[in-house]
Amino acid sequence: MTVPLHQPATGAQLLKYTAPGAVAEILARDPRLIIPVGTCEQHGPHLPLGCATIIAEQLCDDLSDTYKVLRAPTVEYGVNVESARQAVGNSSMRRKTLHRMLNDLLASWEGCGFREFILITAHDHEPHQDALSTVVTREARVRVVDLYAIPLGDLMEGQSEHMHGDEADTSIMLYLAPELVRMDWAQDFMLTREQLRRYRRGHLRVPKESAGSIGRPSLATAEKGRAMYERIRQRVSERIFLTPAPDE
């Protein structure tokens, strides 16, 4: 029998494993649904293709466990960053495809009683973010959480902000799933501020001179990753789960 590498957090309310009657009982108490949105995308030779997915899933499991809110099955694919190098295993959606898929999923869930959707992603590529932020429902509230919109620069040594397969991604993965990280394969590669701005907007590919990562993954540690993850979890808890959403 195959055993999953990472078991869900104890007490996480996973829709995938919940019968319809139990879903109805949970909905009567809390009509929210947490939805992790990942990518199947290279982040350099030292990280797994599911790096962004693993980070988002772990946070969603922890939040579901803490606040007893249902957590949807993971959306495993997103809008990838274009790269000048072909990475074996990469699989991406177009922005409009991801947008339409999320519209369909949320419409279906809204029809059976969910009244708020919390989309959580660890991928700050602008076309990917656009697909999430423009999702439309009939009446239900949609809240999009970009984990890397939370400032982490003071916890890093070689960068002032999150990049791609960098010190932040690698540190968090060293904390959450160290067995999946190959630090001996990590390679640093920096962009200028203008190049980074264009890259985030989807106007610049990861250069062929890069092994696939942007930033300084060589400086990553599990200790930094723990501090980053705990900050992210605290900020998301405070802003999304402990503070009432403003009336629209």
Residue spans of the language-model regions?
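Extended, histidine- and acidic-residue-enriched regions that form the cofactor-binding/catalytic faces
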Residues: M1-E248
